Amino acid sequence: IAHVDHGKTTLVDCLLQQSGTLDRRSAGAERIMDSNDQERERGITILAKNTAIRYGDYRINIVDTPGHADFGGEVERVLSMVDSVLLLVDAVDGPMPQTRFVTAKAFARGLRPIVVVNKVDRPGARPDWVVDQVFDLFDNLGATDEQLDFPIVFASAIQGIAGLDHEAMADDMAPLFDAIIREVPAPKVDERGPLQLQVSALDYNSYVGVIGVGRITRGRLAPNTPVAVVDSEGGQRNG
């Protein structure tokens, strides 16, 4: 989550490429998650989209969200699907109006952000000042002590590098991957109960039709499992 143009989609591209998730056809492509024609034309993310990457023994689910204020509802909709957020902040600009909006929404759900100070390679970058500004923002939003003790990763998504110290960067994004594994709690799910999944996003594939995307809160998914789809009015249909 972040203000528009602070580098979310570029970061996701970088994580996908460095994790080896992409096939050879997609390697080196830009704005991989922005498949919508309007998004590619305007160069911004409009719809929130999810993907998963493998890193070592872990599967990390990632949702790329819009930063433009006009599409803030997309951010709210998908926060129910995640256990933490990467809050990207530009190393020159610091927190911006939409940074405050998305952070407040994350706090409202009790999430503890990992702060990613992005674009540390920009001329005029002032990462230490940005960290202080983020702390002040969190404090003004009523963050808990745990949320105020936020982990920080410095990065340049365009160069594909990250580090815990902006003066001693690694040559890849491993410090960010490691921070995600270290800081983000595993999902709390009752695996033995009956299946329950809240659909937060819809996709479409010409082969399988409509795809419901959401978070499993109970049980397990298995092929050919009969399910009941319940709408917001309480109506039910079997599928």
Give the positions of each predicted feature:
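A short, flexible beta-alpha/helix-coil linker loop
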Residues: 68-69, 120, 158-161
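P-loop NTPase switch module centered on the Walker A-proximal segment
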Residues: 1-89, 93-95, 102-103, 129, ...
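Conserved catalytic-core segments of large NTP-driven translation/proteostasis enzymes
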Residues: 138-239
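Conserved C-terminal guanine-recognition region of P-loop GTPase G domains, centered on the G4
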Residues: 79, 85-147
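Ordered, soluble secondary-structure elements with a strong preference for glycine-centered loop motifs
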Residues: 6, 72, 123-128, 163-171
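Hydrophobic regular secondary-structure detector
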Residues: 9-10, 114, 132-133, 171, ...
